């Protein structure tokens, strides 16, 4: 079964995004968060979501508790939060909370 090709390092994902001129999709989650679990086990396993994320973005998934520097840098106040960045690091969209697959895809489409 296909899955999202998550990276676990923000800095190397930025380098990769700049080399490939692709946007970054950053998901900040917390272990034990029910909405985070639903997003990861339901939305991120949907074939349409997997295809869209892997083809259009450099996906990064980070535990907010272990990456407080990133949480503070981007002023994230809850989990899960999904952020989309240009290759140069400029934030273009954020959508906090859980989204079922169809709604998640709609959010991704808004990024252009």
Task: Indicate where each model-derived feature is located.
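A short beta-strand-turn-helix
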Residues: 6-23
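Typically the conserved alpha-helix immediately C-terminal to a functionally engaged Cys/Sec
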Residues: 10, 35-52
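Hydrophobic beta-strand anchors of alpha/beta hydrolase catalytic cores
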Residues: 25-26, 59, 82
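Short amphipathic alpha-helix with an adjacent loop that forms part of the alpha/beta core around
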Residues: 72-74
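Short acidic-hydrophobic, aromatic-tinged amphipathic segments that line or gate anion-handling sites
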Residues: 3-10, 60-63
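Non-catalytic, surface beta->alpha helical segment in thiol-disulfide oxidoreductase systems
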Residues: 44, 77-112
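Structural microenvironment flanking redox-active thiols in thiol-disulfide oxidoreductases
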Residues: 64-70
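Short active-site neighborhood of thiol/selenol oxidoreductases, capturing the structured segment around
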Residues: 20-33
């Amino acid at each position: 079964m296909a899955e999202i090709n998550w990276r676990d390092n923000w800095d190397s994902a930025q380098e990769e995004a700049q080399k490939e001129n692709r946007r970054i999709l950053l998901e900040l989650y917390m272990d034990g968060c029910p909405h985070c679990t639903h997003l990861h086990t339901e939305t991120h396993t949907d074939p349409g979501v997997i295809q869209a994320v892997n083809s259009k973005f450099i996906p990064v998934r980070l535990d907010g508790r272990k990456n407080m520097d990133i949480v503070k840098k981007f002023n994230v106040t809850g989990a899960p939060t999904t952020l989309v960045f240009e290759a140069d690091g400029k934030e273009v969209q954020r959508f906090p909370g859980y989204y079922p697959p169809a709604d998640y895809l709609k959010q991704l489409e808004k990024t252009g």
